Regions:
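Surface-exposed, flexible coil segments in extracellular/virion-facing regions
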Residues: 70, 75-76
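A short, structure-level motif marking secondary-structure boundaries and short turns
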Residues: 43, 59, 77-78, 105
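Short, solvent-exposed beta-strand edge segments and adjacent coil->beta transition regions
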Residues: 38, 44-46, 76-78, 153-155
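N-terminal, well-ordered alpha-helical segments
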Residues: 57-61, 79, 90-94
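Functional-site microenvironments in short loops/helix caps that host divalent-cation chemistry
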Residues: 25, 30, 75, 83-163
Length: 163
């Protein structure tokens, strides 16, 4: 981890980083209709958010199955889980809360939940106002994320790109 924000690691291999409250501009004036117009949003409470997507191995350890389509190869468990709905994700969180009931991390006893759309965008923007958290140049996207143009038509192991 390159910064000094508080974090904790769970027993499933996940790292969760503290996101402090703050204000930001949410939306994109040149984006889809649902992203317009940009507007000010305040995040009022701190929260912890996963540093990486939930892996297939983590999902299977909690849910007892792996619904993902891209399961070939020795590193499949390190790939992000996919083929899950919002309802599936809510069930995952519910089961995680059952398993973790009363667990204390960094002196805090809390519950797992999905971030709101505002919380997710605030965290993903990382204090920037550019199109991407790393800037405005599409040509830099290959360094920061997997997509149809560089993934070989498959998901890839989490944590392989710049943060």
């Amino acid at each position: 981890m390159s910064d000094s924000r508080p974090y904790f690691d769970d027993e499933y291999g996940g790292r969760y980083i503290l996101v402090e409250p703050g204000d930001f501009r949410m939306g994109d004036s040149s984006g889809t209709r649902s992203e317009q117009p940009p507007h000010s949003v305040s995040i009022l409470e701190p929260y912890f958010c996963g540093e990486r997507p939930v892996t297939q191995a983590h999902w299977q350890s909690i849910m007892g199955l792996n619904p993902s389509a891209f399961t070939d190869g020795w590193a499949a468990g390190l790939r992000p889980v996919e083929q899950v709905s919002w309802d599936d994700a809510q069930e995952f969180v519910s089961r995680l809360n059952e398993l973790d009931q009363g667990a204390e991390r960094l002196g805090i006893t809390g519950e797992w939940r999905l971030p709101s759309e505002s919380e997710w965008e605030y965290m993903a923007r990382a204090g920037t106002t550019t199109r991407w958290a790393f800037g405005d140049r599409d040509s830099d996207l290959n360094d920061y994320g997997w997509h149809a143009g560089n993934s070989g038509a498959s998901t890839r192991e989490v944590g392989q790109k710049k943060a």
